[in-house]
């Protein structure tokens, strides 16, 4: 039952939409901070998962030393950071702590308004169910994050590229879902689009998510630190089959062979660029809002491709790598809005 006397504005779709877009912006920030945490090799600095008490950082020198001593027990310290001092440890600790704190902030930024909007009647029916589903996905993402970190605490000096890719992709799936729900609360556009345009818009979203997963594998394998030329890769447009399929069974190359993983990432980028361009031409013939949306999508895809090339040839500097990661979320948001507006039906609350 809705709260009696709740302000009308609090029950309006516009208020819900602003809330969802704000959470989406926080998720974009989370993806960038997560990228910085990975690139600074800070992700394993906190070796325990304490969802409640872990919100507080060490408050005394004794607390800091205890955290540092726990870090000294994992392979990353023994193999890569032996001899690291406490001050250097604090630097990587703050990155990971900030990443986890932001996750908690996002959880509260979603859950508290969710309760309020549900109690005031702004969320009902299908919209309520969808928002509750988003909350469950957020909880799953927290568990997946720890599952990823745990893979680097016992036998390896870094996290599993499989789990990193899943963690990143799930964050982006949540982002697309939030944007889709928020966009569905806007008035419907009058423009009717051919089925091929609606389908291509959806396919672009799927390809961008697939590319983000491939990018997670590239990051997890540090595959961007090798084959730092473009358009050639190891002197060829297409590397030798023997190199791309060096591992047995062959499927492992798609996930564990740095050359193959990078080649797949490049190939999906070419596919997205070509499809976005052809889709743009199709939408320009139709005109209207679809043409404007498709233009934005293609412009962001082109900018993201350029950022990817620069990141590669400069061997993954922090600023370019983070810009590339941010660019991926912007492409995804633009593609999702375009697909949503091209295909959606109004939610009946």
Curated annotation (Swiss-Prot):
Keywords: Cell membrane, Heme biosynthesis, Iron, Membrane, Metal-binding, Oxidoreductase, Transmembrane, Transmembrane helix. GO terms for molecular function: metal ion binding; oxidoreductase activity, acting on NAD(P)H, heme protein as acceptor. Its EC number is 1.17.99.9. Its cofactor is heme b. It is found in: Cell membrane. PANTHER family: CYTOCHROME C OXIDASE ASSEMBLY PROTEIN COX15, CYTOCHROME C OXIDASE ASSEMBLY PROTEIN COX15 HOMOLOG. This is Heme A synthase. It comes from Azorhizobium caulinodans (strain ATCC 43989 / DSM 5975 / JCM 20966 / LMG 6465 / NBRC 14845 / NCIMB 13405 / ORS 571).
């Amino acid at each position: 039952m809705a709260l009696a006397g709740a302000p009308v504005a609090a029950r309006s779709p516009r208020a819900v939409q602003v809330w969802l877009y704000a959470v989406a912006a926080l998720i974009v920030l989370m993806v960038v901070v997560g990228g910085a945490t990975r690139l600074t090799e800070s992700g394993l600095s906190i070796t325990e998962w304490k969802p409640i008490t872990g919100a507080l950082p060490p408050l005394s020198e004794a607390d800091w030393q205890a955290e540092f001593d726990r870090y000294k027990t994992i392979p990353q310290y023994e193999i890569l950071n032996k001899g690291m001092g406490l001050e250097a440890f604090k630097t990587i600790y703050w990155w990971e702590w900030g990443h986890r704190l932001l996750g908690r902030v996002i959880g509260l930024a979603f859950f508290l308004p969710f309760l309020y909007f549900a109690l005031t009647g702004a969320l009902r029916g299908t919209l309520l169910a969808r928002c509750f589903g988003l909350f469950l996905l957020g909880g799953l993402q927290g568990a997946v994050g720890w599952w990823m970190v745990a893979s680097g605490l016992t036998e390896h000096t870094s996290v599993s590229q499989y789990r990193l890719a899943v963690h990143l992709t799930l964050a982006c799936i949540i982002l697309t879902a939030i944007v889709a729900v928020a966009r569905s609360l806007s008035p419907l556009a009058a423009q009717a689009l051919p089925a091929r345009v609606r389908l291509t818009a959806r396919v672009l979203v799927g390809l961008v998510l697939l590319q983000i997963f491939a990018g997670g594998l590239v990051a997890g394998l540090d595959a961007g630190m090798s084959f730092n030329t473009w358009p050639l890769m190891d002197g060829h447009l297409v590397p030798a089959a023997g190199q791309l399929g060096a591992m047995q069974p062959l499927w492992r190359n798609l996930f564990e062979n740095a050359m193959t993983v990078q080649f797949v990432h490049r190939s999906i980028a070419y596919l997205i660029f070509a499809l976005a361009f052809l889709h743009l031409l199709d939408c320009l013939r139709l005109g209207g809002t679809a043409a404007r949306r498709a233009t934005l999508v293609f412009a962001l895809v082109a900018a993201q491709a350029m950022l990817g090339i620069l990141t590669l040839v400069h061997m993954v500097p922090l600023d370019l790598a983070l810009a590339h990661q941010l660019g991926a979320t912007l492409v995804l948001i633009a593609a999702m809005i375009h697909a949503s507006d091209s295909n959606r039906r109004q939610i009946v609350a």
